[in-house]
């Protein structure tokens, strides 16, 4: 069964800002999420349907927010920790 990977417009905009080397790290993180969606941490409160996977790109911690079910993975947002959750809440309203 093939798993469908979808991107939100916010994620696509944030991915465009990365260089090729950073995109390779991102692709590894996305592949991990496809194989095992529980690799991230499920958020609580207002963001209880969101999972966040944390990974490093050249000594900088990045967060990748996503939702998942058996058939798909929806990549919602990508960024550094600064204002990440505030911007995520604003986007999801």
Model region roles, listed by residue range:
Residues 20, 31, 35, 90-93:
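Short, intrinsically disordered, mixed-charge
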Residues 1-29:
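Arg/Lys-rich, positively charged N-terminal/basic patches that mediate binding to nucleic acids
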Residues 12, 51-53, 70:
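Short alpha-helical segments used as structural interaction elements across diverse proteins
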Residues 29-32, 81:
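Conserved short hydrophobic interaction patches
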Residues 4, 57-63, 67-93:
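Enriched for short, Lys/Arg-rich terminal
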Residues 31-58:
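A short, surface-exposed loop/turn module that caps and links secondary-structure elements
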